[in-house]
């Protein structure tokens, strides 16, 4: 059995390495030496977790309890721990300082099991139990092990890479060749449990992708639409007959029904069932299929009667975000009514529908989803006529919606999980008004505010994702569009992610260094007018290419439904600039 010390030492080594290839090589070498559950457990631990994203894997133990556990483990006062924490800024480093050198005895399996026990402790006295379980394992840990146990417990591992590096490492470790990484990535879009994926690859090698299929209770990654520059481009990209569906300003959702159990998952694969009890109840009443997986959008919405006329009222995305609160669910259920608009069906009564064409899936969707006051199908039109398409777009905008998504009806119009596909094309109101695009950007720094903004940020340094290198490259500074409430909420979010220096996966030029560095965690939506060359930014910069920057950026909203690795990519902004 592999000692946890080997994993902790690799964590420490990986923190210092910046080379993509070297990180993948180290990971592959490590996974190649694991057996059984060690493979699955380690896959989770490298991402600072103890399970897949769609499970609630938070351990329910914050700084205060961790401080108490460290004090108990090392026989010092809580005040001493707090004092050291104030100086070091990292409770993992405090554990390292206080721990005594001892023989390494803990295995990966033991540590993982203990972390699961901490998570599962509940009910009366659960805080004391969690503290005791953590304190006990710290007493058995070496200084290096203690440091990383604490960071994992607090969700602050910060190795500076995401799951893409792991997928490449799995390809080398379990198939002997990096060329299988593309297939493994496709498999991960369907089997979104990184531990299950790793273990199956370890057992079956290059043949493993054939073992993965969609199943209720495990969300797949969402298929996404490409953007186009004009209706003419839309017509060129999807020739002949096409469907155009209304595009809503809401939250993407996957609904999974298996018998009496119904779950809702976000685009980030998080379980959001508890936040939407009204959606769950309506699905139970409206859908009779025994097992079904549906793709749709939750929208802040109400049907009103005015002068004996039924009127649909769509409310802003900000209203909907009130429903993401984990507390006072019933209060906000009344305050913010919602509806779900389904536009796809991915699984039905034991059969995956991912390889069915869009027309086949839509027919099944219409057959098995009965609309109610809360459950709806997306309104659509099917046409070959560009004028009819423009008329439909104008109708959606008049209703206060974002725009349309045009969908191919061809024989290859399958559901491409996890892919931004040319089979779906989006055209939004902002494009028609001359604004180039909205971007989902990652906040990586902030600059001190002045005047009314004193004590807050004056501007945010934002980055795009370089998919190949899995790093964040600066693209713009955003200083307009914020309300006082926005600024207050952003300050609160960023305070949990401030770091003393730029994370190794954030690339910033000297002239753009912010006053405060932020680890990649918070995503905001930004509207801009033009992408230009910029020697000051690093987005898309290469040996023969200057960086790219967004002109006249304006903050629109916080994207709670986006993870950093869901952000706008370098390739996307380059394609936009070049008009591809």
UniProtKB/Swiss-Prot annotation:
Entries under InterPro entries matching the protein: ATP-dep_DNA_ligase (IPR050191), DNA_ligae_ATP-dep_bac/arc (IPR022865), DNA_ligase_ATP-dep (IPR000977), DNA_ligase_ATP-dep_C (IPR012309), DNA_ligase_ATP-dep_cent (IPR012310), DNA_ligase_ATP-dep_CS (IPR016059), DNA_ligase_ATP-dep_N (IPR012308), DNA_ligase_N_sf (IPR036599)
Protein's GO biological process: cell division; DNA biosynthetic process; DNA recombination; DNA repair; lagging strand elongation
Known cofactor(s): Mg(2+)
NCBIfam families cross-referenced by the UniProt entry: dnl1
Protein EC: 6.5.1.1
Active-site residues, as the UniProt record annotates them: 247
Source species of the chain: Methanosarcina acetivorans (strain ATCC 35395 / DSM 2834 / JCM 12185 / C2A)
Pfam families named among the record's database cross-references: DNA_ligase_A_C, DNA_ligase_A_M, DNA_ligase_A_N
Role description: DNA ligase that seals nicks in double-stranded DNA during DNA replication, DNA recombination and DNA repair.
Family: Belongs to the ATP-dependent DNA ligase family.
Binding site for ATP: 245, 252, 267, 297, 343, 420, 426
Protein name (record): DNA ligase 1
Record GO terms (molecular function): ATP binding; DNA binding; DNA ligase (ATP) activity; metal ion binding
Catalytic activity: ATP + (deoxyribonucleotide)n-3'-hydroxyl + 5'-phospho-(deoxyribonucleotide)m = (deoxyribonucleotide)n+m + AMP + diphosphate
Keywords: ATP-binding, Cell cycle, Cell division, DNA damage, DNA recombination, DNA repair, DNA replication, Ligase, Magnesium, Metal-binding, Nucleotide-binding
Domain of life: Archaea
Keyword Iron-sulfur set for record: no
């Amino acid at each position: 059995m592999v000692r946890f010390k080997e994993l902790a030492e690799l964590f420490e080594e990986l923190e210092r390495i910046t080379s993509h290839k070297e990180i993948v090589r180290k990971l592959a070498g490590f996974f190649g030496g694991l057996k059984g559950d060690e493979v699955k457990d380690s896959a989770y631990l490298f991402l600072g977790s103890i399970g897949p994203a769609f499970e609630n894997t938070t351990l329910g133990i914050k700084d205060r309890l961790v401080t108490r556990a460290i004090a108990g483990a090392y026989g010092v006062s809580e005040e001493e721990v707090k004092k050291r924490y104030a100086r070091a800024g990292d409770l993992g480093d405090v554990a390292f300082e206080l721990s005594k050198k001892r023989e390494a005895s803990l295995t990966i399996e033991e540590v993982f099991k203990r972390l699961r026990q901490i998570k599962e402790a509940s009910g009366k006295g659960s805080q004391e139990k969690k503290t005791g379980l953590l304190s006990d394992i710290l007493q058995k840990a070496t200084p290096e092990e203690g440091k990383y146990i604490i960071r994992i417990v607090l969700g602050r591992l910060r190795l500076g890479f995401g799951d893409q590096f792991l997928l490449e490492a799995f390809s080398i470790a379990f198939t002997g060749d990096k060329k299988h990484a593309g297939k493994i990535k496709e498999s991960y879009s369907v089997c979104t449990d990184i531990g299950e994926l790793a273990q199956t690859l370890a057992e079956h090698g290059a043949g493993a992708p054939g073992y993965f299929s969609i199943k209720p209770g495990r969300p797949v990654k969402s298929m996404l639409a490409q953007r186009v520059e004009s209706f003419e481009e839309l017509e060129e990209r999807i020739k002949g007959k096409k469907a155009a569906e209304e595009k809503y300003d809401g939250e993407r959702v996957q609904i999974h029904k298996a018998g009496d159990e119904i779950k809702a998952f976000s685009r980030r694969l998080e379980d959001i069932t508890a936040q939407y009890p009204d959606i769950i109840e309506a699905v139970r009443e409206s859908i009779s299929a025994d097992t079904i997986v549906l793709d749709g959008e939750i929208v802040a919405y109400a049907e009103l009667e005015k002068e004996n006329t039924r009127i649909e009222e769509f409310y802003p995305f900000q209203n909907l975000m009130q429903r993401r609160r984990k507390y006072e669910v019933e209060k906000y259920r009344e305050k913010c009514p919602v509806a779900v608009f389904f536009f796809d069906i991915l699984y039905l009564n034991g059969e995956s529908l991912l390889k069915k064409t869009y027309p086949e899936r839509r027919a099944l969707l219409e057959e098995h989803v009965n609309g109610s006051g809360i459950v709806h199908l997306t309104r659509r039109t099917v046409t070959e006529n560009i004028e009819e398409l423009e008329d439909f777009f104008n109708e959606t905008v008049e209703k206060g919606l974002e725009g349309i998504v045009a969908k191919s009806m061809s024989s290859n119009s399958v559901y491409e999980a996890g892919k931004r596909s040319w089979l779906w094309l989006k055209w939004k109101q902002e494009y028609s008004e001359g604004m180039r695009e909205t971007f989902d950007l990652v906040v990586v720094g902030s600059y001190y505010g002045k005047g009314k903004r004193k004590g807050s940020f004056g501007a945010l340094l934002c980055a795009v994702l370089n998919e190949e290198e899995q790093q964040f490259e600066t693209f713009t500074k955003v200083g307009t569009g914020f309300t006082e409430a926005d600024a207050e909420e952003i300050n609160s979010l960023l305070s949990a992610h401030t770091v003393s220096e730029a994370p190794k996966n954030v690339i910033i030029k000297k002239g753009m260094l912010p006053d405060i560095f932020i680890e990649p965690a918070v995503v905001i939506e930004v509207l801009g007018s033009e992408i230009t060359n910029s020697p000051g930014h690093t987005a898309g910069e290469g040996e023969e290419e200057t960086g790219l920057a967004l002109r006249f950026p304006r903050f629109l909203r916080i994207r709670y439904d986006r993870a950093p690795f869901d952000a706008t990519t370098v390739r996307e902004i380059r394609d936009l600039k070049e008009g591809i």
